[in-house]
């Protein structure tokens, strides 16, 4: 397998090219580390759990486990985005206008009729309400979303929600890089259908998964796309605590934005 790679030991921004077949490191489909969106697709798709994520959420290989199947490279969204092909894959036709709007059938403005979801959401609770409807009606058996870690509440993490209360805990914006697609592992480990609320780069990885492993991707039956203006480094929350002189052990909860919509930073 030839191409650029992330070295499993160095953890640097160096990339390797022209990888020999017996090289003890991973060939991943991005030409430089700065193109890695840290979506977690490579780690999530690996059937051998041969890819882990470092503290900054970059992929790192466990060489002894790697079978060189190539799935990690096949699903990586970092190298390029072909909007025309994506549109044709999802909607059966390419964009007519050539812009970034995509295929828009109709535009709506709304909010959740559940007061708790409406007040706790980043913008009216529509995403959570839709996901709860899918879960409550049995359309899906779980939902891939995010939350703040219970033991380390300054760290955001992806998780599988299966109850109303877990969905409530997932509400709100988290301004940090969260490798959502590592949860593809759940598609292999548990039966049933799942939904996901994911960002564009993560969705791009999923579309590539649909081509690389249609059977596995078919388990994720509903995708709710979220807007994104960019994500901040995972260390941001820790740095904010340090600037304010707050000990991590004293933190019971961490919210990037609190109060009723639109909230306060």
Write out the residue ranges for each language-model feature.
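Glycine-rich loop at the start of a catalytic domain that most often binds anionic cofactors/ligands
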Residues: 66-71, 158
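Ferredoxin-type iron-sulfur electron-transfer modules and their immediate structural context
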Residues: 2-45, 49-52
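Iron-sulfur cluster-binding cysteine motifs and their immediate structural context
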Residues: 18-19, 37, 41-61, 71-92
């Amino acid at each position: 397998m030839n191409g650029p790679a992330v070295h499993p030991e160095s953890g640097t921004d160096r990339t390797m090219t022209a990888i020999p077949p017996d090289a003890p490191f991973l060939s991943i489909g991005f030409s430089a580390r700065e193109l890695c969106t840290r979506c977690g697709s490579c780690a999530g798709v690996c059937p051998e759990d041969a890819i882990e994520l470092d503290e900054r959420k970059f992929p790192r290989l466990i060489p002894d486990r790697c079978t060189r199947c190539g799935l990690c490279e096949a699903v990586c969204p970092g190298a390029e985005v072909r909007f025309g092909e994506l549109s044709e894959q999802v909607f059966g036709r390419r964009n007519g206008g050539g812009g970034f709007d995509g295929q828009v059938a109709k535009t709506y403005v709304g909010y959740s009729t559940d007061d708790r979801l409406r007040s706790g959401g980043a913008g009216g609770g529509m995403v959570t309400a839709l996901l709860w409807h899918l879960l409550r009606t049995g359309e899906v058996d779980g939902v891939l979303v995010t939350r703040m870690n219970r033991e380390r509440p300054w760290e955001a993490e992806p998780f599988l929600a299966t109850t109303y209360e877990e969905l409530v805990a997932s509400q709100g914006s988290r301004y940090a890089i969260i490798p959502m697609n590592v949860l593809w592992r759940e598609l292999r480990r548990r039966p049933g259908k799942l939904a996901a609320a994911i960002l564009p780069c993560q969705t791009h990885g999923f579309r590539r998964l649909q081509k690389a492993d249609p059977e596995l991707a078919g388990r994720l039956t509903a995708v709710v796309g979220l807007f994104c203006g960019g994500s901040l480094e995972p260390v941001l929350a820790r740095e904010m605590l340090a600037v304010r002189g707050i000990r991590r052990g004293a933190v019971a909860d961490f919210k990037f934005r609190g109060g009723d919509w639109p909230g306060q930073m």
